[in-house]
Amino acid sequence: MKKGFLAAGVFAAVAFASGAALAEGDAAAGEKVSKKCLACHTFDQGGANKVGPNLFGVFENTAAHKDDYAYSESYTEMKAKGLTWTEANLAAYVKDPKAFVLEKSGDPKAKSKMTFKLTKDDEIENVIAYLKTLK
C-alpha cells in the first residue's frame, strides 16, 4: 500500500513539474523575445535561411525538416530517429542546444551551430507560444 502511495506521489510530482515547466506562453511577448534570434534566423513564411534555418513552421515538425538548409549530421541523425519539435523538445533545445543535440542524436561528437541560449523560463514559454503561431 505504501509503495502505491509513493509511486502515485512521485508520478504526480513529475507531472506537476512538467506542466509547470511548460506553462502557456504569450505569443506577442514571444515575438519580442524572438528579436534576439534574428541575427541567425528568420521567421517569415518563405523567409531566407541565415546561419540557422528559417523557423516558420518549425513547431510539431521533424528535426532537419527544411530541404533548403544544410543541417549537420547530428541534426539529420535526430530526424532519422523521428525527433519532432514539441514544446518539451523546443524548451530543452533553446535552454542548452549543445546538450540537447548530444543527448538526442546519440553522437558523442555532436555539434550545433547554435550557441545562443534562452535561460529564462518565461522567455522560453513565450518564444514557443510564438513559434506555435507560425504555420
Curated annotation (Swiss-Prot):
Heme c binds at C37, C40, H41, M114. InterPro entries: Cyt_c-like_dom, Cyt_c-like_dom_sf, Cyt_c_1A/1B. GO terms for molecular function: electron transfer activity; heme binding; metal ion binding. Residues 1-23 form the signal peptide. It holds the Pfam family Cytochrom_C. It comes from the Bacteria. This is Cytochrome c2. GO terms for biological process: electron transport chain; photosynthetic electron transport chain. Cytochrome c2 is found mainly in purple, non-sulfur, photosynthetic bacteria where it functions as the electron donor to the oxidized bacteriochlorophyll in the photophosphorylation pathway. However, it may also have a role in the respiratory chain and is found in some non-photosynthetic bacteria. The keyword Secreted does not apply. Keywords: Electron transport, Heme, Iron, Metal-binding, Photosynthesis, Signal, Transport. It comes from Rhodospirillum rubrum (strain ATCC 11170 / ATH 1.1.1 / DSM 467 / LMG 4362 / NCIMB 8255 / S1). Binds 1 heme c group covalently per subunit.
